[in-house]
């Protein structure tokens, strides 16, 4: 299994049977390591409805015929625009041809902009992906909460955690989350895209190391073998 960081919270996860694009925000992303028009994937997985996580989902789904896997309301929102979808809800899992996806709880919000007010688009989620004998957890934009320890019981190989603060966990809370999740490895995300979420990932790595946790900092475009 290969994991490539494409910037912000977007990752390409390549399993032996499928290519999964997580939170596909490339167009308009100042940290993007790829162009949406150059991306190929078999599935699109969305943690919640905010534009910096869904930005290219509809265009990619239409171009590639790739189903969008997301919470029910978000899936229906894209289905109404012609996308193939598979709707789920937090706590539910489904066995896809490539492996299993379970949506986990996440404490955040989920909406799309529509004129002067946002449209509510279901519960924000984390993505727990099991394939090729490995487990990857994409935390979405969650805040720190105690029940992360229940998610950790899945035996996580790689946890993708936001560290940008302001909208999500900051470095301190993300390091505390590792005490609950206990993954084999953590990768920081959702930072330095804009000044409001500017962070030094080395500080997160140091806080994590003090708790006995391993961190791999990926520059946009870098790849990790899981």
Question: How should these model regions be labeled?
Answer:
Residues 1-19, 26-29, 100-102, 203-211, ...:
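Zn-dependent metallo-beta-lactamase
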Residues 12-50, 55-62, 73, 109-120, ...:
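Pre-active-site segment of Zn-dependent metallo-hydrolases
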Residues 13-16, 96-97, 129-132:
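Active-site beta-strand termini and strand-to-loop segments that position acidic
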Residues 21-24, 41-49, 69-72, 137-140, ...:
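Active-site neighborhood of phospho(di)ester-bond hydrolases with catalytic His/Asp-centered motifs
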Residues 28-29, 50-55, 75-78, 92-95, ...:
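Active-site environment of divalent metal-dependent phosphoester hydrolases
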Residues 55-113, 118:
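Glycine/small-residue-rich loop that forms an oxyanion/phosphate-binding "nest" at active or ligand-binding sites
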Residues 67, 79-93, 175, 179-226:
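Binuclear metal-ion centers of metallo-dependent hydrolases, dominated by the metallo-beta-lactamase
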Residues 113-179:
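Active-site-proximal loop/helix segments of hydrolase catalytic cores
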